[in-house]
A protein has these predicted regions:
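Short, solvent-exposed loop/turn segments at secondary-structure junctions
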Residues: 63-64, 102, 135-136, 187-189, ...
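C-terminal accessory domains and tails appended to enzymatic cores
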Residues: 2-23, 161-174, 186-292
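Hydrophobic/aromatic ligand-binding patch that stacks against planar heteroaromatic rings
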Residues: 47, 151, 155, 207
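Histidine-centered active-site/metal-ligand motif
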Residues: 33, 141-145, 211
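Active-site rim/loop-helix segments in enzyme catalytic domains that contact anionic ligands
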Residues: 1-124, 281-290
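Internal alpha/beta domain cores that form substrate/cofactor-binding pockets in large enzymes
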Residues: 56, 84-184
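A general structural signal for well-ordered alpha-helical segments in protein cores
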Residues: 80, 148-149, 269
């Protein structure tokens, strides 16, 4: 076996990832819904922003149905406003709204959605592309997450092809290759990188607490399920009755972050599958020359 083959065949192991200085390099985060950022990776987003990374978030849907007791129009307005507040807390530099109706992406052409993502990659020219892990969908019942994951994963490599959407080039955009891909999910498979969010957990919790509309609906769902099973859920019932989501969100976010951290000997953490240089980082390290 050659040395290069040995390098390429090294099995990945999870390691604590220290966020380096961004120097205004771009992280492009593509999510389906407003609450995805805070709940899945709010601590890491806050760490990126604090370290000088420019974080751009693309929200694909308008979350028009994610509420309880509000009209569709009021739901769109409320969720957008709460998303902006949460993003400000985390240090997000820019939000891009694609405005697709929520919970309907299963009927949207994946190729059409991919084109939207390619455009954003070529426009913002990110160092890292961040989205749902298409290979960590076991137990995932949200088709919006699944469709975004698949389209974004393909957009990573098709954004580098000048034959894919030459109309972008005619508009002055250029093909672009992201150096890293960061994948997250409900349960990440083959975790490679763990980010210690002990210093940014408070901001993650505070950002999550901005999503009153969506989390009240979530609490209502929990109460409905519990009732069917013959249970009461006082914390969730209190949210439905009062609209105060903070006690529930503080408990849930702190507990989940601590559980992830405990698995890696940390106080609080978030897990990712990170792919560098298209999965050929060993090749790059063996034959490449780093620029000064």
């Amino acid at each position: 076996m050659t040395e290069l083959t040995q390098v390429l065949q090294l099995q990945s192991m999870s390691a604590t990832h220290v966020i380096e200085s961004g120097n205004q390099r771009v992280v492009l985060l593509i999510v389906a819904h407003a609450d995805d950022v805070a709940l899945f990776l709010g601590g890491t987003v806050a760490a990126w922003a604090a370290s000088g990374w420019r974080v751009v978030v693309v929200r694909v849907t308008d979350d028009r149905w994610d509420s309880v007791g509000l009209s569709e129009a009021d739901t769109i307005i409320a969720n957008a406003a709460e998303f902006r507040r949460a993003a400000d807390i985390l240090g997000v530099a820019e939000i891009v709204e694609l405005g697709y109706p929520t919970d309907t992406l299963a009927d949207v052409s994946e190729v059409a959605l991919r084109e939207q993502f390619i455009r954003q990659i070529r426009l913002h020219r990110p160092y890292a592309l961040v989205t749902f892990d298409p290979y960590a969908m076991y137990g995932e019942d949200n088709q919006d997450h699944i469709k975004v994951a698949a389209a974004a994963d393909e957009a990573f490599w098709t954004s580098q092809f000048d034959k894919h959407h030459p109309e972008h080039l005619a508009e002055g955009l250029k093909v672009h290759g992201c150096f890293e891909r960061w994948y997250f999910g409900r349960k990440v498979v083959d975790v490679t990188d763990v980010v210690d969010i002990s210093d940014t957990l408070d901001r993650k919790i505070e950002a999550a607490c901005q999503h009153t509309t969506m989390m009240t609906n979530f609490a209502n769902q929990l109460c409905l399920q519990a009732s069917t099973g013959g249970w009461d859920l006082p914390l969730a019932a209190s949210v439905v009755a009062t609209g105060d989501i903070r006690p529930m969100m503080e408990a849930l976010v702190a507990a989940s972050s601590a559980a992830t951290g405990a698995a890696h000997g940390l106080g609080a953490a978030e897990e990712f599958r990170v792919v560098t240089f298209g999965g050929l980082a060993g090749y790059l390290e063996h034959l490449g020359v780093r620029r000064p």
